[in-house]
Amino acid sequence: MTIDHVSFDVPEGSYTTIIGHNGSGKSTIAKLLAGLLEKASGSIRIDGLELNLENLAKIRSRIGIVFQNPDNQFIGATVEDDIAFGLENHNVPQADMQEIIKHSAERVRMTKYLHQEPTRLSGGQKQRVAIAGVLAMKPKLLIFDEATAMLDPQGKDEIKKVIMDIHQETGLTVLSITHDIDEIAQADYVIALADGQIVSTGSPEEIFFNEEKLKKIQLDVPFSMKLSAELEKQGIHTEKHITMEGLVEELCRYNSKM
């Protein structure tokens, strides 16, 4: 997908999501930021550095990226080996390495699996290992390219919680490419793409409470909002909620007052 005149900033310490229909250019942006694709024109700046051949190694050391297929990211023979892979490539002393591995595994709740082989892990556990490997390198920016897309519901929930916990506890900047409504709802800022261009930006509420904007990015109105509209027809007024959880909480309060 060609990216055309795309310009945006990701504030340091923020949780930003990029959304859009399949083929809108979301993953292309992730690969451009990681230096996996070369831009034809324009400029990309990360942590004050322009992305070019001279700065590529420095920038990659400040970025961690997790892709959607957990099987394609597991390199080591065990969980411990996989987390250690990047550290070994950077010649981190063995004594320091063990402490970093332990701390990174604790962050994603995989400490008891350090000696497990990848074949014994679920998809969600493999993604947690991928995140641990990224955290071990102490990046300033975490990029998740549809990291939950290939997981079952339990795995999705586990990864979303891990990502949010890391962001809240460390203050790391997170850029997540996702279709997940629950994840988008928790973001500070949303960038909406369509056909390689940015068509809308703003808070989750600004994007999802505007049906015209949703049509532009070819996304459906969240089910919670459709249900609210039907309840309104029955004389039950509710606030707009992006997620079902928010709507259910309001309905419970409504029921307790009856």
What are these regions (language model features)?
Residues 117-121, 125:
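Conserved ABC ATPase signature
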Residues 42-50, 59:
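Conserved ABC transporter NBD signature motif
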